[in-house]
């Protein structure tokens, strides 16, 4: 497996690069949550990748969030622990990217490793309009 940064250099698909940039932004912003003044505005680099008016994220339990709700959830998550992602593979077809990562979440000193699949759907301007999240983890 390789780092998200290394994968971004190697992939050739434009939409794959955007999906990997999404993961890279996540990795850069989460550590900022420990700094004073951290808030939802920290996600501006991620918002630049999003079709804000039509964005929809469907999570593990089929919960649906628009961009403002997701930004609030991201902020709460970032404040609750640490995140690290490692690249597994990416698949791109027109308008769609499937990104597989190994994610490590650390909360209270406990590290949980999760295999994730994120399905990114893009609008005609190459902005993320829909995101589905799937996970595998130890019981």
Each PLM stretch: what is its role?
Residues 40-94:
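A solvent-exposed, acidic/Ser-Thr-rich amphipathic alpha-helical stretch
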Residues 29-33, 57-58, 105:
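Alpha-helix C-capping/helix-to-loop hinge sites
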Residues 1-14, 72-139:
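A beta-strand edge to alpha-helix "cap/lid" segment located at domain peripheries
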Residues 1-49:
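Short, low-complexity N-terminal intrinsically disordered segments enriched in polar/charged residues
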